[in-house]
């Protein structure tokens, strides 16, 4: 097991022989282009903003930690600022981007690979053509330090027919995904080191 610490997450990564076939299972994929480059996605909204807005009751924010704004998009910060009461702490702009892997929760009637195929189709507006899905897998256990939440996910590689140049040019209208990106271009992101480790582990364990 390998551990990564970021300012907002503690991440445990371990190779596993199989993925539980359960409706509680969350499975994701790092897609690999035909020119051998790994793909991640940028989320339309940040997890921090989602958490804050889901728990606004009443829907007025009295104050918000500057630390939380480091993990929000600028349009979200403006929205929160609009709801802030007079005299609350200032909010600063960030260059934040919420990276995620493509995938999601397993349906009862699906296999693991069926779930990956369905989620990738939905999240990319059917833009990616899947050739094959790898057989090796890793278990990813994430503790969110900001909200004290724990998540258990699984990940595989998914090989596609498109070149990276094509992938990054796609316009995505999915409600959750704003665009697809090369993981290798995201080295300034707080998730980069552990996402790259996951990719390399899956790639060289095949």
Swiss-Prot record:
Keywords: Hydrolase, Magnesium, Manganese, Metal-binding. Its cofactor is Mg(2+); Mn(2+). It is an enzyme of class 3 (hydrolase). Its EC number is 3.1.3.-. The active site is at 119 (nucleophile). Induction: Expressed in the early phase of the viral replicative cycle. InterPro entries: NUDIX_hydrolase-like_dom_sf, NUDIX_hydrolase_dom, Viral_VD9. A motif (Nudix box) lies at residues 104-125. Residues 23-206 form the Nudix hydrolase domain. It comes from the Viruses. Belongs to the Nudix hydrolase family. This is mRNA-decapping protein D9. It comes from Rabbit fibroma virus (strain Kasza) (RFV).
